[in-house]
Structures are given as C-alpha cells and as structure tokens.
Design a protein with these regions (language model features):
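Sec-dependent signal peptide recognition
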Residues: 2-8
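N-terminal signal peptide c-region/cleavage motif recognized by signal peptidases
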Residues: 14-15
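Zn2+-dependent metallopeptidase catalytic core
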Residues: 21-194, 200-228, 232-236, 432-438
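Beta/coil-rich, acidic/histidine-enriched accessory regions frequently appended to metallopeptidases
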Residues: 84, 322-496
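Surface-exposed patches in mature extracellular/periplasmic domains of secreted proteins
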Residues: 155-171, 234, 238-244, 263-267, ...
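Zinc-dependent metallopeptidase catalytic helix centered on the HExxH motif
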Residues: 198-269, 273, 285
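Active-site-proximal alpha-helical
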Residues: 272-359
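Cellulosome-associated attachment modules in secreted, modular CAZymes
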Residues: 494-557
Length: 557
C-alpha cells in the first residue's frame, strides 16, 4: 500500500516539475523497484539542493533547473513518518537556514518580512549597492517585490497571509545557491510560523523573460509571487490540493507580475493546453505549472480581469479551507456555480479562448479583442490543431480526447456562405461540441451545438464575413479515459425562404405544387437554392411526397 501511495505522489511531483529528466528518471527507477522510498526522496532533494550527491544514474552533464522545489518538499512531508531517521536528518540538515559566510539581516519597508542573507561564501547575494544604503540592492529588490506581493495577494485580493506568529514576528526569507527558482518549506521555521521562503541568490543564467528591467529582476519577481502563494496555500488548506498548488502559484505570477511572462516562455511547450489540448487538465492526476491558463481564464472571465481583486479564486480558497478532502475539480465547480456558471459551461468557453491565442489571437493595435488579455503577446503559444479543412463536403473524426481535454479543428471559410456541421460524439460521455467564428471585423462569435442524449447535433454557421471558424469537441466530464467524435461538414447556401412558396411570390397555390412535384421527380430546370429551401415544406431536411401532402394542406387552409 505504501508503494502505491508513493507512486501516486511521485507522479504528481513529476508533472509539477515539467518533465525534468532527472526527476522522471528517479520516479521511473522507484517504480521499477530499483530505489527504496528513502532513496527516492533523498535523490529528489539532492537534485536541487546538493546535486553532487545524486546517484550517478541520475546525474546529467549539467545541473537541471527546476521551477519550484516546493512540491518535492510537500512529498517529503507526506512521506516523513515512513522514512528512516537518518534520511530525515540528512534532509533537515539541507533545509536548515545557512549559517556559512558573513551574514546580515534586513527587514522589508512594508514591515512583513525578515531577510537573512550572506555577503560572502557560495550562498552570497550580489554585492552591488547602488544607493549606498549598506544593504545589497539584490536584497532590497526582494524586499520590495515581496512587500508588493503581500499587498496584491493578501491586502488586495484577500488570500490568506502566511502564519508568522511568534519568533521574531516577521515572515522569514533567505537566499541560497541551488537548482531551483525557490521553495517554500515547513522545516526549521521560527516560532510558530507555518513556513518560510528561500529564494535563489542570483538568478543568473535563468531563462529569458519579458521584464523590462531584465531577466534577473523578472525571475525574482515571479518567484516571490509564486512561493509566497505557496505560503498562503499552506495557511488556507494545508496543501491538500496536491499538484494543483503549482497551477495556482503560477497563476499568481500572472496576477502580481503579469508583464514578466517567465512561465509562459520557459515552462510551456510540454503537456500544456496548447501543445497538448487533447490531454486532460488533470493529465497524470493533477494540474500543474503549465496549466495555469485554467485559473487565468477563471479570473479574467469571472473577475473582469482585475489586477486588484480575484473574487472567484478567493472563494475557491475559502471553500478549500473547510473542504480539504474534496476533489479539487469539484471545488472549482463549486466556485463556478457560485459565480453563475457551471463547470461544463465554463470549460467549453475555456477551450474556445485557447483556440484564439498565439498566431490566431484576435488583436487590434496590440490589444487583445477576445479571450486572454495577453493572447497575442510575443511568445504566447498557439494551440495545436487536430486538422484543418479547406474544402467541403468533408467527413472526418477525432479520437484520443481525455476527460477535460479537446481536439481543435480549424475550418477555413474563404469564399463560403455557410457551413453545415453534423456532429456525432461518442455515446455515454459528457461532451460539448463548441464552435467559433472569427469575423473580419475582429470579433468572435461562439457557442455550442445542441446535442441530444447520444451526443448528436447539427448547426449551420454563417461564415459570409468570417476569416476562419472552428469546431472543438471537448470532453467536460471530470473522470474517464479517452473519447472521440465524428462529423460531416457541408456547404450551405444560407438561402432564406417560406416553406412551400416554391415560386417565391408570397402566395401558396397550385403553381407551387406543380413545381414541387417537378423538383421531387427531377423534371424541368435545376432548382435554385431558394426553391430547394422552400421545397422542404415539413422541415425534415429532404423533399419527398410528405412535402407534397403538407403543401396541399397549406394551400387548402
């Protein structure tokens, strides 16, 4: 039983580290029975805190950088009661605040944070002190960024602040040379604090971001927002959400420092809703960093894209305080219901937003006109298409859609009037068939095809003024395996008519009846679009003797 539980936790952490080859290799070795649980967690902790101690099997040519060490430490905490004392001692020693080098303490101007930093040794921060304050600029930056993060996440948005009662009365932060942006830990806390934060001591050599002040400041900013949100989560619900805490902390980067776009540039491209839209939001058992667009959608759609408040996500975390054992997706559904929507309805809109990003973003003068406010920002990913249709009629199908996943189908509309879609989704699954039309005036019309109990339905899209359209089958149920759908798309003339008025003279008489019979028998001139429309008198998508009977009844009325 322990082995099975550990595998589950390991899979969540693997997803959270965005396919770190080292972490994946460690997990796979454990699953093959080649590592004990103690060796598993030791190697994971070594991977970012002391890579030279890694088992030789997991060492690469260069040390891998991970986004966040917190999920590994959450896993360590969950396993702790089953670990050997020697293992705990090693890890606690690695997590203990550093004492080497000449060390100083600085208190943030906002009065919330205490920073312990070294000016000499391997963990020293950069020594530059441009303002001559006697405190390294690097430490002052961190203080400013965390003060601002507190103001945004706690004072403004209403998320819980970290518990830092007792001790020195400040929330403690330190700096380390390590293989992660940072981490939040429950080890070696001061007084009755729940957690403390550790930031990288230089952020030199980290991935590029879009902070106008440079990559170093940008990396520090998003780490402050991210790790501080972990501290808030711990106060809210004791990290009961598993890997979802990483999705939420990455969203916090967008909420606090939206212009930096570090995660967008460095942690997309593998398993996210753009590179793998057919993968479920909870692929491998949990959401993670790369899925932060889900909370970004919830916030922008239901909170008016405020960078001051975030009511729907505040509600979500308040709810989690008393529902720590509830499935996280059910908690999201509860929040959506509270804000006048439902999970299936919101998730259908979410995948439409995801279609119009990157090269398909709807942008005018650099401003997004639909969906995410940064959908057209340089570097924002473009969702992968299952296929593109350029000519019609066409019949096709899609498979391999996981629960909470979709397939995106582009419909080119050049020179077309209407497209008639007949959709046949797999039976026995909660599914939607979303459609969208990008008009040539840079507006987007979208909706869903009305499906019956067998997931069948049809719609005619007016694409006369469209630059493109989309069909997006999406599985909205919370659990399951993989599913599929088939569809047929035909041209539609969009002809307008009055049923039975074959001659289009606003009268129903014998001349209409004669022409109807000729059309059914294939006699006379080829019928026009209006005639074909009017010939379907009983609106069953075909013209036959039943239409003759119906027209006779109408004439005799």
């Amino acid at each position: 039983m322990i082995h099975r539980v550990l595998i589950t936790i390991s899979l969540l952490v693997t997803g959270n580290l965005l396919a770190s080859t080292t972490i994946i290799a460690i997990d796979e070795a454990f699953e093959r029975g080649e590592l004990t649980q103690d060796e598993l967690i030791l190697n994971k902790v070594y991977s970012f805190l002391q890579p030279e101690l890694l088992d030789a099997r997991f060492r690469g040519e260069q040390t891998e950088l991970i986004k966040c060490g917190t999920p590994i430490l959450i896993q360590y905490e969950a396993m702790q009661s089953d670990l050997a004392e020697s293992t705990i001692t090693i890890i606690e020693d690695l997590l203990s605040p550093r004492t080497d080098g000449l060390r100083e303490t600085f208190f943030s101007p906002g009065g919330h944070f205490s920073f312990n930093y070294a000016t000499t040794g391997t963990g020293a921060v950069p020594s530059a002190d441009a303002d001559g304050s006697g405190v390294p600029d690097y430490v002052e930056w961190a203080a400013d960024y965390l003060d601002y993060t507190w103001a945004q996440e706690v004072d403004s948005a209403g998320f819980a602040g970290p518990n830092h009662v007792g001790g020195d009365g400040f929330y403690n932060v330190s700096f380390e040379s390590m293989g992660a942006y940072g981490y939040c830990t429950t080890s070696a806390v001061d007084g009755s604090e729940l957690t403390r934060l550790v930031l990288h001591n230089s952020y030199i050599g980290f991935g590029a971001n879009q902070d106008p002040e440079g990559n170093v400041k940008g990396a520090m900013k998003v780490t402050c927002a991210h790790e501080f949100k972990h501290a808030s989560q711990r106060s809210e619900s004791n990290w009961s959400e598993g890997g979802w805490v990483e999705l939420d902390a990455t969203w916090a980067e967008e909420f606090v420092y939206d212009y930096v776009n570090d995660s967008m540039l460095n942690f997309m491209g593998s398993g996210d809703p753009y590179s793998h839209p057919h993968w479920g939001l909870d692929h491998d058992g949990s959401g993670s960093y790369e899925d932060y667009a889900w909370e970004d959608f919830m916030h922008q759609r239901f909170d008016g894209n405020s960078y001051v408040v975030a009511p729907i996500l505040e509600y979500f975390w308040n709810w989690r305080q008393t529902h720590t054992n509830q499935n996280v997706m059910d908690s999201y559904a509860q929040a959506l219901t509270q804000y006048g929507s439902s999970f299936p309805e919101a998730f259908g809109e979410y995948v439409v937003w995801n279609f119009f990003t990157g090269s398909r973003a709807v942008v005018t003068f650099g401003i997004s006109q639909f969906g995410y406010d940064d959908a057209g920002v340089n570097g924002y990913p473009t969702a992968t298409l299952a296929t593109t249709h350029n000519s019609y009629p066409v019949s096709s199908s899609v498979t391999g859609i996981e629960n909470l996943g979709c397939k995106m189908i582009r419909l080119n509309t050049s020179g077309q009037l209407g497209l008639e879609i007949d959709f046949d989704g797999q039976d026995g699954v909660q599914m939607s068939a979303m459609w969208a039309i990008r008009q040539d005036d840079n507006t987007v019309d979208w909706g869903s095809i009305d499906l019956d109990g067998s997931n069948n339905g049809s719609i005619v899209l007016d694409v006369r003024d469209a630059t493109m359209a989309a069909l997006i089958p999406v599985v909205t149920q919370l659990t399951g395996s993989t599913y599929g759908a088939s569809y047929t798309i035909e041209l539609n003339s969009l002809a307008e008519c009055d049923p039975g008025d074959i001659n289009d003279d606003n009268n129903l008489d014998v001349s209409d009846l004669v022409r109807l019979v000729a059309i059914i028998l294939g006699n006379g001139a080829i019928p026009t679009d209006v005639e074909m429309c009017a010939a379907d008198v009983n609106d069953d998508d075909q013209s036959n003797v039943q239409d003759v009977v119906t027209l006779v009844d109408l004439i005799l009325q």
